[in-house]
Amino acid sequence: MLETLYQSLVSAGADSSGCAHLGVTPDGHSWAEAAVLPAGVYDRTAILEGIVYPLTGDRTGARVVNGFIWRYLFSADILQRENVTFEGAYLEDELFLMEYFCHAQRLAVTEQPLYRYLINPNSATHKYMRDFVQTFQRFMERKSALAERFSLEAACPQWRENSHWAGLLIAIGNEYAPGNDKPLRARQQAIEDLCRRPEIAEAISGLVPEGLSANKQLVARLVRGGHFFILTQLYRLKNRM
């Protein structure tokens, strides 16, 4: 993998390269996941339009750009010169890619699936996260700083609303996850309280998320309509609580 990415980078005169990957389940089933962009060589403008802007403002669409950092070969010079680092253990990959690709000048992409990614049902992202809301708040603080630093708001005017919707949908699924030992009524109240927060309420009233799956569309409609009891009952049935 690294040799192919490196050769792709060198032959294109690029500072970064990326590839597709294979998703793999524990039972051996696998499928190809497309690269972030079609095979080719991209300049800074195309990198911003194809990676940075979607990471900034399009977080609920049908083809969200994910923070798959293991699909790229990065420039050590950029990382060290610009001090691009990680913070925290959740959603940090999105911020890392946002910041890094604001500095990258040339990206070579191959559609070869060079990495095998195990879909682990026991990973942290598949379990109840007790501190998710606090983690997401910190994520938004850092994302806001990046958006301001790199003047991203002009290209992504509703990035806050879009990002808050994405976080809200994750928070709802997390609140009703089997690992949460709170009573159902307390979980429902937690979601209602979250939706009343000014930044979340603004996103709910100011943006109708597009490109959601059928299930998430239903969740979004129930939230926008204030039907939290129905939402809770649907999750109770779904998760057999």
Q: What is the meaning of each model-derived region?
A:
Residues 1-91, 95-109, 118-128:
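Donor-binding/catalytic cores of nucleotide-activated saccharide
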Residues 4, 12, 99, 138, ...:
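Alpha-helical elements of Rossmann-like donor-binding domains used by nucleotide-donor carbohydrate transfer enzymes
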Residues 138-159, 196-202:
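C-terminal, non-catalytic tails of nucleotide-sugar-dependent glycosyltransferases
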Residues 13-14, 177-241:
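Membrane-interface aromatic/basic loop that binds lipid-linked glycans or pyrophosphate carriers
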Residues 89-90, 97, 106-139, 153, ...:
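Nucleotide-sugar-dependent glycosyltransferase catalytic core
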Residues 161-174:
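Amphipathic alpha-helical repeat scaffolds of TPR domains
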Residues 156-162, 185-189:
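Short, charged, amphipathic alpha-helical segments
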Residues 120-127, 148, 219-224:
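Short, charged, low-complexity loops and linkers
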